[in-house]
Amino acid sequence: MRSRWSRSYIRVVNYHNTDKVDADRFEREIASFAEHFTSVSMEDIDRFFKTRKWDKDKPGLIPAVFEGFRNGYDVMLPILEKYGFKAWYYIPSFFMDIPVKEQLRFTEHYDLTVYRPEDYPDGRYAMTWDEVREVAKHHEICCHTGNHFQIGRETPDYDMYREIVVAKRVLEEKIGRPVDVFCWLYGEEYAYNPRAHKYLKEAGYRYVVSNLKIEKIG
């Protein structure tokens, strides 16, 4: 996200799968990020929107780890911790509660691509809630709907409520802290779906993320 207000900026790098086979590449990338950028916390975002300035010596960068996959914990988290670099984890909050034997079917139904199922022969592809809580100790937890569900202009209200409001409540109850950020599927902007905005406000989100920007919910 390039700042409209200064020459400083925040970049976002998306990770939708962090398979073991690519661990060396991920480490090289995070090591480079740690050298050339600074990580971004919610407090940094709050200050950025309040002051209209990025006040760090280095530009900001958010590694965005999507979908709540187990490899986001097993593979990516140790690398992030090694370099002390904060990531934002975008969690479809109902995924964690799907029984192990049904998780692959769930991923196929909701367009959560498992590229290397052989990495986890036990069939568990989602993080456990204990693992999500471990991630939450040093990283930001954001809501990516409940079921990895695309919310469109014609989506019924009960689906919007479940995927926006209930999904946030589940995350907050499980990790024991507020969840302030909602991320649309497939990068739609905040203005894409005005009908959904009342649910974002009702739920108490403060920011919404698209492929193009981070927007403050007014």
What would you call each of these model-derived segments?
Residues R28-H36, I79-Y83, H138:
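A short, Lys/Arg-enriched amphipathic alpha-helix followed by its capping loop at the start of a domain
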Residues F69-R70, N147:
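Short active-site segment of divalent metal-dependent hydrolases/proteases
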